[in-house]
Each structure stands twice: as C-alpha cells, then as structure tokens.
C-alpha cells in the first residue's frame, strides 16, 4: 500500500509498504480522508515532537519511520481474532489515544492523563496511508448523516468539546475565542452548540475572520486595528466576556485573553506554547480569574459525532483544499507552514 512515512525533521516520504492483516482485537480500516493537524506540521519542522524519542512503553516505537495522521475516517475491511463489535463495511473514526488502562488515571477514566500515553500517528502508525490497523476499542461508528469529510473533523471537534467541558461554561455565557484556526473555529461552534450566549472572535487573518462570521460569531475583531478589550467591553455593557479560550498558545494571545475577560472570568488555554508565558499575577488575583488548560479529549468523541450528525457544528467552510497522498508535503504541509493565512484545514485522500 501507499503510505507517508516520517523519517526525521523535514523528511516525509510517500512509499509503497506492506499492508499487514489485523492481529487479535484489531480492525483493518481503509482510510477515506485524513486531515493535516498542526502537530503534523510540528513533526515536519522540528520533530520528533510528539513522536517518541525513546521506545514507547506500550507500542515500543521510537522515532521514524512512522506513518503520521490521526484526524481521519475510514471503512472496516477486515477483522482480527476476537473482534465482535464491528463488521466489514462499517464506516468508522478512531480515537487515537493509546493508554495502559492500568495506571491511577486510566482507572478513573482520565485516559488523556495516562502515565504511558501515546497517540496513533506518532507512537503507532497513523492514517496518511491507504490502510491502517487499529484496536477495536478505539473505533466509533459514523452515522449515514456524517460524510467521510465530516468524519475527518471528529477528532479535532472532540478537542473542542473537551475544551468546553474543561472551561465549565455556563449556558448563556458570553464567550471570546482568541485565534480562529481549525481548533478555534471548532471551539466557537462547540460553545454555541452547548448553549453559549454571544461568542466573539479575535483573529488578525481576514479569511479566518470571514469564516468566523459565517459560522456563528456575534462579532469578529481584528486585533491589529481595534483594541479587543475595549471592543468586547462595548459589546457586553462594560463587563467583558465571562469566558475566553486561548486557541493560539503564545504570549500575545494569552495577554489578549486576560484583557477581554471580566472579573471572576475563566480563561481556558487550548493552544500549545513551546516557550514560557508570563502571567499577570496581580490582575488575575485581584479579579479572581481562573486559568485552566485543555490538552486533548477523553470521552468526547460521541458528542462530536452527534454535533456533526445533526448539523449543530458545520465544517464545510473550514476545508481549504483537498489533495492526494502523493502531494502531502508540497501541497499540504508546506502551504500550511508558509501560507497559513490562506488555509484552515487541508484534507488528504489516500
């Protein structure tokens, strides 16, 4: 089969490799569509990033070559011994978390906190390939109302749904989103689906501001032209937002989240910063603001599928381009790195 293999930083090759049968408890899936995630870009630019630098305690994989890709939908084509919950022809998505099931956190159902955590597409082969083999427990069925393309958004939407859960958002709350990339746009829609009042978006890129307006934002603010804090204060009778999501993960974005939120507000940091971020302690303390973090998902995949199935979350406008697997690097990864302002999500068809 054809697969895109990460060998090292800056080195992803599309090659012909063997497509093996599923083992006990495993399911072989024909990959239909796979989205390119920001973490895939990190692996190309500065990896290994999430890819293990030493043998993973569960998969024993280390470095390359490894097949990237974890935002995907597919169709079951073969079953390993003992598989009872799926049949050939089932349309599925995969929760890519790899966890031990034995540690303190796994016993609590908090798999994202597993002390041996790994992820399909990094610590095990992923979905930038014609076929993939995955454990039965990780599969979820897609209803007929969710297309293959929509299915490729289940994983990032689960990230968004988890972030809303972590924020403890109250129904009717005013919400601000800092950064309208793929996750920010999905967090915005997940908030609305969960009962938010008005949702405001702070985003410098024109194309992403347009998508924000088209998918539910009450107001969209360009921080290069307007003071976001003052603008949101005007829109909320001086109170500013009850809740903000930092979906960027850098110092300016966090500073903005602090300025656009009111007293006793919650700031949920979803974006990942590779550098330390300074915190305005006095302001947070004096206004009794809470800062929380959201780094993945646990049991949010069914909710994400439901949101897509009944069209409470719409993803069509987030699709910037569709490409074949052979063009993964030159038409997918490199454009996202070099011209990110023109793209939101690029889908890959193996």
What are the residue ranges of the model-derived segments?
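NAD(P)H dinucleotide-binding glycine-rich loop of Rossmann-like/cofactor-binding domains
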Residues: 56-70, 98-178
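Rossmann-fold NAD(P)-binding glycine/threonine-rich loop
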Residues: 271-288
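Short glycine-centered segments of the SAM/dcSAM-binding site in methyltransferase folds
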Residues: 91, 174, 265-266, 290
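N-terminal Rossmann-fold NAD(P) dinucleotide-binding loop
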Residues: 184-185
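Adenosine-nucleotide cofactor-binding segment
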Residues: 174-180, 192-256
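Glycine-rich beta-strand-centered segment in the early N-terminal region that forms part
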Residues: 20-34, 49-104, 143-145
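C-terminal hydrophobic helical "lid"/dimerization subdomain
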Residues: 243, 251, 255-259, 298, ...
């Amino acid at each position: 089969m054809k697969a895109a293999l990460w060998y090292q930083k800056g080195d992803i090759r599309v090659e012909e490799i063997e497509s093996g049968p599923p083992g006990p408890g495993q399911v072989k899936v024909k990959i239909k569509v796979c989205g390119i995630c920001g973490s895939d870009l990190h692996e190309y630019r500065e990896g290994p990033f999430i890819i293990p630098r030493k043998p993973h305690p569960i998969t024993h994989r280390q470095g390359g070559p490894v097949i990237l890709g974890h935002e995907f939908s597919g169709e079951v084509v073969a079953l390993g011994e003992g598989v009872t919950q799926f049949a050939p022809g089932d349309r599925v998505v995969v929760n890519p978390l790899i966890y031990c099931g034995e540690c303190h956190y796994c016993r609590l159902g908090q798999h994202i906190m597993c002390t041996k955590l790994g992820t399909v597409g990094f610590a095990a082969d992923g979905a930038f390939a014609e076929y993939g083999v995955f454990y039965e427990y990780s599969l979820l069925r897609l209803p007929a109302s969710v297309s293959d393309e929509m299915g490729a958004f289940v994983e990032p939407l689960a990230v968004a749904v988890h972030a809303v859960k972590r924020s403890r958002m109250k129904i009717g709350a005013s919400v601000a989103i800092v950064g309208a990339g793929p996750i920010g746009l999905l967090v915005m829609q997940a908030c609305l689906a969960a009962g938010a009042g008005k949702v405001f978006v702070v985003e410098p890129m024109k194309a992403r501001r347009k998508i924000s307006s088209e998918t539910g934002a009450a107001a969209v603010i360009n921080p290069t032209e307007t003071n976001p804090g003052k603008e949101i204060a005007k829109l909320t009778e001086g109170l500013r937002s009850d809740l903000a999501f930092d979906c960027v993960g850098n110092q300016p974005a966090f500073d903005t989240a602090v300025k656009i939120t009111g007293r006793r507000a919650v700031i949920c940091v979803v974006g990942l910063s590779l550098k330390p971020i300074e915190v305005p302690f006095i302001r947070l303390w004096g206004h009794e603001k809470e800062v929380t973090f959201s780094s993945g998902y646990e049991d949010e995949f069914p909710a994400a599928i439901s949101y897509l199935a009944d069209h409470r979350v719409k993803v069509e406008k987030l699709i910037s381009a569709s490409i074949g697997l052979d063009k993964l690097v030159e038409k997918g990864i490199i454009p996202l790195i070099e011209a990110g302002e023109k793209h939101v999500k690029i889908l890959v068809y193996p």
